[in-house]
């Protein structure tokens, strides 16, 4: 029982909400959501997105939070505290840790791109460049192994330095500051974007708010300068730098945008790092200092295939011609581990072979706030697993 007594918790509910939202808010909110929205009907897509956010995303989120709060630990130890005696649900805890590590094997590289571009705009590297020259900088960055590894390592080291200061003194303190700054930045960028010429359950709300606001930044800005918004990295590192180089005060707005992107990605990095550290401390008996040192070294090494996959190891094309290591790692996380993990959490919380719906609902109803009604039980037990299984299968075929 001694490790449980020493386990640090969040200092405030606001800190928990902002850190959790920081983990959810990331690169996909900016380089995927706005483009997919434009491709699939605009407001109609957002409407259906919000419906499924409530029908699928929110229930699974409550399950993860309930397991963590009731189990008082990281994934594996929380499962062990709640699972029926003799069952093996805690094995999924190892997959949770592997998923976090796999995510960080490429996410630190992409976060490094954001930091790189922030400093490029801050120091005026884009000043006076033509559209072709601005577009070429991204390719030059990808082709440089030294630059790619350098920024990836900077993000990794910085993330573990923050987490090394403890949950409240590190992740919560920095996360609250970064998320507050991120929300201010995105509001400033939205307001500025609309001044350009031309026509153009709280964690879930914040995540969706940032995604929608990203669209309000990107589309008016692109259309004002006659530039078609792309998807993925091309949107962030080719399309938008072209917009900023053609815009009055582009250096300032480019700097603020990539500062926003750095905050969005780094808030995810430190939240996932904290999860990795918690797992290492609880499962291996390490102290936080050792977990941070080992984690830094391990993730810098494990991040090399992604960072070097665009240059010296570009011959590795795991998903066919033109693919990269990042594509493969992202496929494993997004198409297999995330929906698969959601399905396991769901089955653990609603079946009699796991924690059970009644205990899960009782945990959700602990404390103040809205209560979980009993009528959702059939939906959670019989409909929601099928919906998530369909997403899992669809992502793999």
Q: Which ranges hold each PLM region?
A:
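Extracellular loop-to-transmembrane helix junctions
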Residues: 37-63, 147-148, 338-339
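Loop-to-transmembrane helix boundary motifs in multi-pass membrane proteins
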Residues: 15-17, 149-150, 205-214, 251-254, ...
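Membrane-embedded translocation segments of transport machinery
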Residues: 2-6, 10, 176-266, 270, ...
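Transmembrane helix-boundary motif of multi-pass solute transporters/channels
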Residues: 14-52, 224, 234
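Inter-helical loop and helix-membrane interface segments of multi-pass membrane transporters/permeases
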Residues: 4-7, 35-40, 70-95, 108-168, ...
């Amino acid at each position: 029982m001694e490790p449980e007594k020493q386990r640090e918790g969040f200092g405030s509910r606001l800190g928990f909400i902002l850190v959790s939202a920081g983990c959810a808010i990331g690169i996909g909110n900016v380089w995927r959501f706005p483009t997919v929205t434009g491709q699939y009907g605009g407001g109609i897509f957002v409407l259906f997105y919000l419906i499924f956010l409530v029908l699928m995303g929110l229930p699974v989120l409550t399950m993860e939070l309930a397991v963590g709060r009731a189990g008082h630990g990281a994934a594996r130890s929380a499962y062990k505290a709640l699972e029926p005696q003799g069952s093996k649900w805690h094995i999924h805890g190892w997959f949770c840790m592997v998923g976090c590590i796999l995510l960080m094997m490429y996410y630190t590289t992409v976060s490094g791109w954001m930091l790189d571009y922030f400093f490029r705009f801050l120091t005026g590297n884009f000043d006076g460049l033509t559209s072709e020259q601005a577009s070429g900088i991204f390719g030059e960055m990808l082709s440089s192994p030294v630059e790619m590894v350098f920024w990836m390592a900077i993000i990794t080291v910085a993330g573990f330095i923050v987490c090394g200061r403890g949950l409240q003194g590190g992740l919560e303190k920095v996360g609250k500051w970064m998320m507050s700054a991120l929300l201010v930045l995105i509001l400033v960028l939205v307001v500025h974007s609309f001044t350009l010429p031309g026509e153009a359950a709280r964690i879930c709300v914040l995540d969706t708010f940032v995604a929608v606001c990203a669209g309000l930044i990107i589309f008016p800005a692109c259309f004002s300068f006659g530039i078609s918004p792309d998807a993925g990295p091309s949107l962030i590192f080719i399309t938008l730098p072209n917009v900023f180089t053609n815009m009055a005060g582009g250096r300032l707005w480019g700097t603020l945008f990539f500062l926003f992107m750095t905050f969005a990605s780094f808030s995810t990095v430190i939240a996932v790092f904290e999860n990795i550290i918690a797992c290492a401390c609880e499962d291996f008996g390490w102290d936080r200092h050792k977990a941070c040192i080992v984690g830094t070294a391990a993730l810098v090494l494990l991040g090399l295939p992604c960072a070097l996959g665009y240059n010296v190891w570009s011959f590795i094309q795991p998903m066919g011609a033109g693919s990269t290591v990042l594509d493969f790692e992202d496929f494993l996380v997004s198409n297999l581990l995330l929906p698969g993990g959601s399905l396991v959490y769901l089955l653990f919380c609603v079946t009699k072979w796991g924690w059970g719906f009644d205990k899960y609902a009782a945990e959700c109803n602990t404390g103040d706030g809205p209560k979980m009604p009993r009528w959702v039980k059939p939906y959670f037990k019989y409909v929601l697993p099928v919906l998530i299984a369909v997403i899992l299968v669809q992502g793999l075929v």
